[in-house]
Amino acid sequence: MSPSVLEIRGLRIETQAGVLVHDVDLQLRRGEVCTLVGASGSGKSLSCLGLLDLLPPGLARTQGQLLLDGQPLAASSVRGRLTSLVLQNPRSAFNPVRNMASHAIETLRQRGITSAVARARMAHCLDAVGLADTERVLQSFAFQLSGGMLQRMMIALALMAETPFLLADEPTSDLDALSQARFLDLLMELVQVHGLGVLLVTHDMGVVARCADQVAVMEAGRIVECQPAHELFQRPASATARTLLHAHQVLCRSQP
């Protein structure tokens, strides 16, 4: 039976200068999108990286328990087996001297898939994310593909890895409006079809409105509000959520 709920409880991230993330609780459910929203510098990306134990040098996760369907698990078992990560800057996710086929082969090898079966699996996953020209994409290097195509390639690698959960850190911020819309459409399709559980980090309330089932609002390293998306938009409980919603409404009114 596949896992259905991944939780982090009491996540704390510190430097020598002090605490940056304070006792964060998050819950991801299969088939749902949980958005972690807040202003720049609020601790969203750090929380995402802390969950995967991928913090940069000088930062440490000093507290926090991971649970899968209520059972404790080690952080080392989360990456690759349970979760995949989509980064804000897609080019930084790929080795620039290796083509896409090399990245795909490495991912599939971790699943014990090789030879002709691997090639068929690559083609299937690339087609699922809208990268139809399979051979051209697989022979391409990161500098030869657009940002939108690289984001899709990261999703394809997640499908190859067959992880039940996906963490996406500001995945649309470097994309143009059309590529952003296509990426979000793809993400929602994969949630519905494959039952992915997604943690989507964003500062864009438009993205939240479009995708979110649950919303966690972050300010100064703390979760200040967490509730279903439709309730947050109707009755925001925190000043931070009200400020974000007001800014979103002003921006929408200013657009032609």
UniProtKB/Swiss-Prot annotation:
CDD domains given in the database record: ABC_NikE_OppD_transporters (cd03257)
Protein origin, superkingdom: Bacteria
GO molecular function, one term: nickel cation binding
Entry membrane topology: Peripheral membrane protein
Residues of the ABC transporter domain: 6-245
Entry's localization field: Cell inner membrane
Catalytic reaction annotation: Ni(2+)(out) + ATP + H2O = Ni(2+)(in) + ADP + phosphate + H(+)
InterPro entries: AAA+_ATPase, ABC_Ni/Peptide_Import, ABC_transporter-like_ATP-bd, ABC_transporter-like_CS, Nickel_NikD, P-loop_NTPase
Cellular component GO terms, alphabetical: plasma membrane
Top-level class of the enzyme under EC nomenclature: translocase
Pfam families linked: ABC_tran (PF00005)
Keyword field: ATP-binding, Cell inner membrane, Cell membrane, Ion transport, Membrane, Nickel, Nickel transport, Nucleotide-binding, Translocase, Transport
Residues at which ATP binds: 38-45
EC number: 7.2.2.11
Purpose: Part of the ABC transporter complex NikABCDE involved in nickel import. Responsible for energy coupling to the transport system.
Family, per entry: Belongs to the ABC transporter superfamily. Nickel importer (TC 3.A.1.5.3) family.
Complexes and interactors: The complex is composed of two ATP-binding proteins (NikD and NikE), two transmembrane proteins (NikB and NikC) and a solute-binding protein (NikA).
NCBIfam families linked: nickel_nikD
Record's protein name: Nickel import ATP-binding protein NikD
Gene symbol of the encoding locus: nikD
